[in-house]
């Protein structure tokens, strides 16, 4: 759920959406797996960070609801997590957003719109995928952004996913 704090319209109230994100990647065809990047691995890579937005409250950093929400969470004993809170990603902090997965809260620098979501997604995934285009739709709102890819990513010849900074595949352990 989110809201447009300071907006004079329906969106000033807390409300939620179901969104669809399309990620287009580009690179050379990896000869070991005969594809640019395995589709299921794109989904897993994206979901690792994007699950922070699932069933989360997404508020702009100056929204006065934040302290009140945290106070209620504290009183309920869920501010620092709960055993049933299993669908959460790793905490992250970027220039555009900070995720607090234990309390299902994402604080953003800007009002969360489809355009804002695209900026955040790109910022979180640009070092993991060679993204050429992101499209995000939510309700009747939709936006796309295209990016220029420079160079190719070093990928595993066995499973096709990006190698880490040490040349090791995080999925299968292959070493370059």
Where are the regions a protein language model picked out?
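Charge-rich, low-complexity N-terminal segments
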Residues: 1-145
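Long, C-terminal-biased catalytic regions of enzyme "large/alpha" subunits
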Residues: 123, 127, 135, 143-176
